[in-house]
């Protein structure tokens, strides 16, 4: 009985969230502190099964000062897609190898943002999915997520 009640609550929450997101053209999430932030979005919120999903992760500098992000490898970002139960169904970096070199990205007044994109083309079953975009900086890791609907 508890499992059924919990399942009903999850469905209601995801349905309400989906209805709220439908009012907006695409799915967007933004997280920030006083100096910098992250914006995660998709090209739209509702997809047909098999339709490509375009994901965009933006890192923004809200100041006129340089902000430096340091990395342990050549990887700068990642995208993860999870189903309604929280199971990871896709990770952008899954089958990739990154050079083991230290690196940095500097956001300043001349270049206050950097954008990373990825496209997912395989098929999922219809339902709600959470997409998380991650900046993998060792000193300032950040993430943002959005919910999409596959019909």
PLM feature segments, named:
Residues 4-5, 17-19, 38, 133, ...:
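Intrinsic-disorder/low-complexity peptide segments enriched for small residues
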Residues 25-40, 45-118, 128, 132-137:
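Contiguous segments within soluble domain cores/interaction surfaces
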Residues 1-28:
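Secretory targeting signatures
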Residues 122-151:
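Terminal connector regions
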Residues 9-11, 56, 120, 134, ...:
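Generic detector of bulky aromatic hydrophobic side chains
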């Amino acid at each position: 009985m508890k499992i059924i009640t919990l399942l009903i609550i999850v469905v209601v929450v995801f349905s309400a969230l989906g209805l709220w997101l439908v009012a907006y053209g695409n799915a967007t999430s933004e997280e920030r502190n006083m100096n910098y932030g992250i914006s995660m979005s998709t090209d739209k919120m509702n997809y047909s099964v098999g339709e490509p999903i375009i994901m965009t992760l933006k890192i923004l500098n809200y100041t006129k000062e340089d902000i430096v992000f340091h990395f342990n490898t050549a990887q700068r970002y990642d995208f993860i897609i999870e189903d309604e139960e929280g199971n990871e169904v896709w990770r952008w970096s899954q089958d990739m190898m990154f050079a083991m070199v230290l690196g940095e990205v500097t956001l300043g007044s001349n270049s206050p943002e950097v954008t990373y994109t990825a496209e997912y083309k395989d098929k999922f079953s219809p339902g709600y999915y959470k997409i998380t975009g991650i900046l993998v900086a060792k000193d300032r890791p950040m993430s943002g997520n959005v919910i999409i609907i596959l019909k």
